[in-house]
Amino acid sequence: MEHELLFLGTCAADFSPRLKGDCRDRFDPDARRSSAALLDGRYLIDCGPHTPDALAIAEADAGAITDLFLTHTHSDHFDPANIEALAALTRDGLRLWASAEAQLPGMKGVTVMRMEKFTPYAVNGELTVTGLKANHEKTTAPQWLLFTLGEKKLLYALDGAWYVNETYYFLRNAGLDLLVADATVGDYDGDYRVAEHNSIPMLRLLLPSLRTFGVVKEETRVFLSHLAPSLHRPHSETEKIAASFGALVARDGLRVSL
């Protein structure tokens, strides 16, 4: 069975003013929205300030969403008001899967599912999710999300620099089919975010080692996301930079088969 990942947003927190202008009701690769994605039309990954608009632009059925998976609680990924509004559209409410230590407000229509690290959870008969440790601000309860759909494996690894040792060894020989990697910082050295976000030079070092360790295969598609436009060249140029080390660049509205 083929699955689909829809990128609803691919930005870090420096949003373009064009989102309130000519890109108000359309996607543009150089006017990115808050990072979020939709798996198989019913599994939402993060819900930030722009997620409802992105769902509408993509003509996705928000009422069909059953589960929301949270990477962490920074406001560009976690908007409680938008989550409540989304839950009100669903038929049976919304399950919110979050790290066990996440501090969350009460949200009407939302059932919180607490996730311990490195423990697989059966979401339903076809999907399993595992939260992995991520190198990001601890107070936001960060986790990367490993999804297994039958024989397919997807790692959604935004907001976290490098790889935490336990996560790296957990993923040894995982042979991911799809990797969504944090690429907040562009193609230059010396950025201070090295302990919480990846840069292009960091990814150049990481990807060959991930292949050596079996985390990814030769045929694994690696998409860079969570890009800060103020730290990157335009999308078309970034695509060429990423291609030079075997990666692709996600854009809002992009649909990827799995």
What are the language-model segments listed below?
Residues 3, 65-66, 93-95, 217-223:
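Residue-level recognition of the N-termini of beta-strands and the immediately preceding loop/turn
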Residues 5, 46, 55, 72, ...:
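Divalent metal-coordination and catalytic microenvironments
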Residues 162-255:
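Cap/insert and terminal regions of metallo-dependent hydrolase folds
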Residues 42, 48-97, 176-179:
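Active-site metal-binding motif and surrounding structural segment of the metallo-beta-lactamase
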Residues 91-150, 247-256:
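Metallo-beta-lactamase
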